[in-house]
Amino acid sequence: MPSLLSSRIRNAEFAKKIVTDPAKLVPYFKNGDYVGWSGFTGVGYPKMIPNALARHVEENNLQGKLRFKLFVGASGGADTECKWAELNMIERRCPHQVGKPISKGINSGRIQFFDKHLSMFPQDLLYGYYTRNRESNTIDTAIIEATAITEDGGIVPGASVGASPELMQLAEKIIIEVNTAIPSFEGLHDIVEIPNPPHRTPININRVDDRIGKPYIKVDPKKVIGIVEADYGDITCANSPQDETSQAIAGHLVDFFHHEVSVGRLPKNLHPLQSGIGNIANAIIGGLAHSPFKDLEVWTEVLQDTFLPLFDSEKLRFATATSTRFSPQGFEKFYSNYDYYKERILLRPQVISNHPEIIRRLGCIAMNTPVEADIYAHANSTNVLGSRMLNGLGGSADFLRNAKLSIMHTPSVRPSKKDPTGITCIVPMATHVDQTEHDLDILVTEQGLADLRGLSPTERAREVIDKCAHPDYKPLLREYFDIAENYCLARGAGHEPHILANAFKMQLNLLEKGTMKIDHW
C-alpha cells in the first residue's frame, strides 16, 4: 500500500479492502441500479469508479444499456456526471444538477429528473419516498469520496458533505474513494444524523460555529466492498467575473444594509449571510469586504472564492456551509493557508446547512438569483419559459422561506440574440413559480431595490416596476399593470390584477419574434 494512502487509512480492517484497479469493482453495478454519489456543487464527488464505469460502457458499446438512477446531494463533478449523461448512463436524477449534457438529456426526455428542496432531499431518501417501488428502502451502491479514514473507521469527507451520511445509511454496498491528491480535511466537518419522526428533537445549534456532531461519518464496515485511491482533485472552473451590473446590485444591497442598521432592524454585524452562486453573489460578498461591516458570520450552502478575501480582511468571523466550491486558484489559496481557514470554516450535511429550523433561529439574510421575477414578486428559479429545466431549485427556497430577510437579485435584462437591450427579467407573470410572493422581502436589480415588506400586491407591482425594471421595458410593464388593474377593478377582482389573455404576451413574442418588446397589449 502506498505510504500516502496508508497514512490516510488508519483502520486495519479498511486497509484490507483496498482495490488497486477500479475496474475490478465494475461488475458490482447492474442496469437499473440505484446509485448514490457524494458531492455538492461539483466538489467532493467520486472520480475513479464513475470514470471506470464510463470506460466500461464506452469500450463495450453499452450506451443506453447500463443506466442508473443517480442520487447526489446536489451537482456532481462535470468530468464524471456529464460523461455519464453523454453515454446515456443516467435513467433518473435528483435533486439538482449542472452540465449541458445533463440538461440536454433532461429536456429531451431521456433523463427523468425531479428537483427538490435540498434540505428535504436527504430526509425524503430516509422516508423511502424515492425507493417505494423496491422491496426494501435501500439503494444498491453509494460511492463516497473521503480524505481520510480514522482509527475507529470514521469516513472523513473532502470539500463537501452534502447527502453522504444518508446515502451511506441507505446503501447496501459502499465504495470509498480516498483522495490523496488533496489534503486531509479532518477536523473541518460536523456530522450529525437526524432520526425520522416521531423521534426528532430540537437541533441544538444557536450560533454558526456550534458543533453538535462528530468530525466524520459513521459507516458499517460490512457494507464496504472496496476502497480505491483517487489521484486527482476536484475539477472546477473559474468563477464568473464581476461586471458593472453585478457591482451595481451589490452597491444597492450594501446601501440597504446600512439603512437597516441605522434604523435598528439589523445589528452592526448584520445577521448570518446566505449567498448563492454566480457573479452577483461574488460581487455582494466582495462589496462587503470593502464596507465598514465587520464580525460578519455566514450560514450558507456553498463557500466561493470571494469569501477568502473576506476572511483575510478579518471582517468575516466564521462560516458554515456544506460545500467549499472554490476555483482552481481559490483552492490553491485555501490549501496554502489551510490552518488559518480551518479554524473559521465548518462543513455540515445539507440537511443541517439548509435546515429551516436553524435558518429561522439564526435570522439569516438570504440572497439568491432567479431566472425571472414578476411584478408581484413571484420568482422562477428553474424553468426557462416555463418548461426548459436549467439546474433545479437547489436550496434557495430553504433559505428564502425561512430567513429573516429574503432577497432575490437579478439583472433587469439578460442578453439575447436579436434584441440589443436583451430580454426582461421582470415580467407581468412568471412562467413558473418556485418562490411565491409570500417568500420575498426584497427584489433588486442594477436599476434599484424594491422593498416589498408589508405591501399589498398592487403596491408591490408599482414598486417592482418603478425600482427594478429596465427603462426600455418599464413603460410596457406599467401599461400592462394599468390595463389589468382597471379591467379587474371593474369586475370586482382587483386584489392582484391580471389579464390572462395577455399575461404571457411578452414571452410569446420572444418565441415568435426574438424580442420581448411587444407592439401593444
UniProtKB/Swiss-Prot annotation:
Gene3D superfamilies: 4-hydroxybutyrate coenzyme like domains (3.30.750.70), Acetyl-CoA hydrolase/transferase C-terminal domain (3.40.1080.20), Glutaconate Coenzyme A-transferase (3.40.1080.10)
Listed EC numbers: 3.1.2.1
Annotated keywords: Cytoplasm, Hydrolase
Cellular compartments annotated: Cytoplasm
UniProt binding sites for CoA: 276-280, 391, 395
Keyword Zinc: no
Pfam families found in the cross-reference section: AcetylCoA_hyd_C, AcetylCoA_hydro
Residue numbers annotated as active site: 301 (5-glutamyl coenzyme a thioester intermediate)
InterPro entries reported in the protein's UniProt record: AcetylCoA_hyd_C, AcetylCoA_hyd_C_sf, ActCoA_hydro, ActCoA_hydro_N, NagB/RpiA_transferase-like
GO terms for cellular component: cytosol; mitochondrion
An annotated Gene Ontology molecular function: acetate CoA-transferase activity
Gene Ontology BP term (one): fatty acid biosynthetic process
Keyword Transport among UniProt keywords: no
Reaction(s) this enzyme catalyzes, per UniProt: acetyl-CoA + H2O = acetate + CoA + H(+)
Family of this protein: Belongs to the acetyl-CoA hydrolase/transferase family.
UniProt function note: Presumably involved in regulating the intracellular acetyl-CoA pool for fatty acid and cholesterol synthesis and fatty acid oxidation.
Name of the protein described by the UniProt record: Acetyl-CoA hydrolase
Originating species: Schizosaccharomyces pombe (strain 972 / ATCC 24843)
Gene name of the encoded protein: ach1
